[in-house]
């Protein structure tokens, strides 16, 4: 007998926002308020989590649920418009989608590797592979549509 999707483990690998230690978190147990294994501070997955050149690949490889990455810059007006929309999306979809953010100015290696040429750029990953991309400001409904897209056959 196969497990239903609801019974399957949903794991995310996230960097602690306080000490940068990578932690594997069972998304089915978010109500238990996961804590960092190193510094013991809370890992809050109801908001976008910052990633960097140093840890993005490990976060993507260690996460079983879709990952939506926001490529942004602090000085970008449209990025500031998108920030509260992404905050709401992360809160509403916590446990189903991991929302991460990459500062494109501070992480040029990943910015170049992912060919981010406009900001904000939203990229959806499944199993560490890009499945959808959108450049520019978008609506909350479009975020759901981006995550719902089936992976491209390559």
Question: What is each residue range found by the language model?
Answer:
Residues 118, 123-154:
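Non-catalytic, surface beta->alpha helical segment in thiol-disulfide oxidoreductase systems
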Residues 18, 64, 71-75, 118:
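Short pre-active-site segment immediately N-terminal to redox-active cysteine/selenocysteine motifs
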Residues 25-34:
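Short linker/helix segments within small regulatory modules
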Residues 65-67, 114-123:
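Structural micro-motif
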Residues 16-19, 36-39:
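Short cysteine-rich clusters marking metal-coordination/redox-active sites
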Residues 71-85:
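Conserved redox-active cysteine motifs that mediate thiol-disulfide chemistry
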């Amino acid at each position: 007998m196969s497990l239903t999707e609801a019974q399957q483990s949903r794991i995310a690998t996230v960097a602690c926002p306080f000490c940068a230690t990578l932690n594997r978190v069972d998304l089915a147990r978010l109500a238990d308020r996961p804590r960092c294994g190193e510094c013991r501070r809370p890992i809050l997955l109801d908001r976008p989590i910052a990633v960097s050149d140093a840890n993005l690949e490990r976060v993507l490889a260690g996460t079983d649920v879709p990952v939506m990455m926001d490529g942004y810059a602090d000085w970008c007006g449209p990025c500031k418009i998108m920030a509260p929309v992404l905050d709401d999306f992360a809160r509403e979809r916590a446990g189903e989608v991991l929302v991460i953010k990459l500062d494109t100015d501070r992480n040029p290696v990943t910015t170049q590797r992912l060919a981010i040429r406009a900001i904000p750029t939203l990229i959806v990953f499944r199993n560490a592979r890009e499945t959808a991309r959108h450049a520019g400001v978008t609506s909350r409904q479009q975020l759901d549509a981006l995550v719902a897209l089936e992976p491209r056959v390559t």
